[in-house]
Amino acid sequence: MAVFTSISEAELSAWLSDYSLGDLQNLQGIASGIENTNYFVTTANGRFVLTIFEKLTAQELPFYLNFMAHLARHGIPCPAPVANRRNELLGELKGKPACIATRLSGAATLTPNAAQCAAMGAMLAQLHIAGQSFTHTMPNPRGSIWRATTAPRVRAYLDGEQAALLDSEVEFQESTDFAALPQGVIHADLFRDNVLLE
C-alpha cells in the first residue's frame, strides 16, 4: 500500500489554496508504490498526482524536482512538478515534504513487447540528451559510500560463493576510476510499474 500518510479532502483543499489549480474535485489514494504516499488529485484545472515523501528530505528533493521540471520543459513526457504561488516546487504537508505534479495518461504494462521496450529505450535516450543541459549535480546515492556500508550487511545473508562474488564486485568497484567516465543524470528507477504506455 502506498498511502502511508492519510490526508483528508479538507486538509488537501487548504494546502492547494497555495496553488493556482482551482478547487479540489476528487482525491484518491494510489495503492501501488513502496516508498512514498501518492494520491490522484483532480481539481477544476486538471488531473495531478500528489506525492508525500516518506524518506527523502526537503534538502534532497530540489535536485529531483528541478530535474523533472527541466525534462518536462525539454519535451520529455514525465510528470511536471507544479510550483506554488511563491514559485516553489516543494511544499510541506502533514510535516513532510510534498509536491504536486501533472498526471500522465497511459497505463503500466507488466509484459511489454519488443516494440514497447524499443520505444522505452528511445525515450530513455531522449531523456539522457535532454539531461545534458541540466547543470545541477548531486552525489550518487548508491555510490561508493553506500556500497561500503551496505555490502557488509548483505554479506551476512549470503552463502560462501555469493559472498565471494560480492567481495569481488566491491573490490572491482573500489578500484575503478569513475571520474574518467562520462557523467550525467540517469533515471535509476526504471521498472515496468514506472512506465506508462498508451
Could you say what each language-model-derived stretch is?
Residues 1-27, 70:
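Regulatory N- and C-terminal appendages and interdomain linkers associated
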Residues 7-18, 135-136, 147-188, 198:
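An alpha-helical support segment within catalytic cores of ATP-dependent transferases
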Residues 22, 63, 168:
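Short, conserved clusters of charged catalytic residues that mark active-site
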Residues 28, 83-84, 139:
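Proline- and acidic/polar-enriched loop/turn elements at helix boundaries
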Residues 31, 36-43, 49-50, 81-82, ...:
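Active-site acidic catalytic loop and adjacent metal/ATP-binding pocket
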Residues 43-135:
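ATP-binding pocket architecture of kinase catalytic cores
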Residues 110-121, 138-140, 156, 160-167:
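Short, amphipathic alpha-helical segments
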Residues 142-144:
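Terminal low-complexity/disordered tails
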